Amino acid sequence: MRITGGWSIVRQRLRTALRRPAAPTSSATNGRVPVRSPEELLAQPERLARLQAIEALTRVTPAHFEVLYRSALANYASYVQQLPASEAHHHAGLGGLLDHGLEAAVFALKLRRGHLLPPGAPTELIDAQADLWSYACFTAVLLHDIGKPAVDQVVTLFDKRGGALGPWDPWSGPMQAQTYEVRFVHNRNYQMHQHAAPLLARLIVPPEGFRWLASEREVLGAWLAVISGMPEDVGPLGQIVEEADRLSTAADLTGGIARQTPATRVRPLYERLVTGLRYLIDRGALQLNRPD
């Protein structure tokens, strides 16, 4: 694969975005959030630091990083914009889903270093496929919550004059609007977003990435099982993604005062506790007392 440009182009784009006199990416007026370019969204210092950490944790060349990793991150940022990752749990503020994805990607690539993949394979095969398995970890964790905007949230789009354009169709591609509002679906299924990921994967993973993942059947099979939310086939790849998700969630919940999106009303403590308990029960992380 011969590619020109590389990370220097990305740095230049990010420097340009930082010099623009645009409003901060977290700004929102009357509950409406501006649609931003991926360069603007990723130029925030903390996000830029995570981009650099992701690059440092990979072994690919800068040119390959641009095509395989950077393009996926730009697609992810363009798609999730500043949507929250949850209503009243982790990363519930503006940009929560983007921040969670980037942070979980860093954790996943760090955790991946502690695994020899595929398990039990000869050393030569492990070394030959090392970069591919790392990419599988990266893309799988980036996709683990990508279904939330499609099944857990309803996003309304507005034009530059403030006129309503109707609901966003998340199955078709990124938002095409000036601003947007988000609300959460009530009585939602907390597992459904996991099963939606394969339908949205091509909006995030570049064609070159898909071809690479499909080049090894064992890698592709494990990757598809993980992004489809199939716990019985989780394997080491799924364990890495789950642990990275937990670490990012824990870091946010213990990192200070939680934020919420403008459209989400401030909830009393008891209601947030009930929401959190319901979330844990629905995910199977907390079991109720059962008769013998």
Functional labels for PLM-detected ranges:
Residues 2-72, 112, 116, 198-292:
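Histidine-centered, transition-metal-coordinating active-site segments
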Residues 29-179:
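Acidic/His-rich, divalent-metal-binding segments that scaffold phosphate/diphosphate chemistry
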Residues 85, 116-268:
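Divalent metal-dependent catalytic cores for phosphoryl transfer on phosphate-bearing substrates
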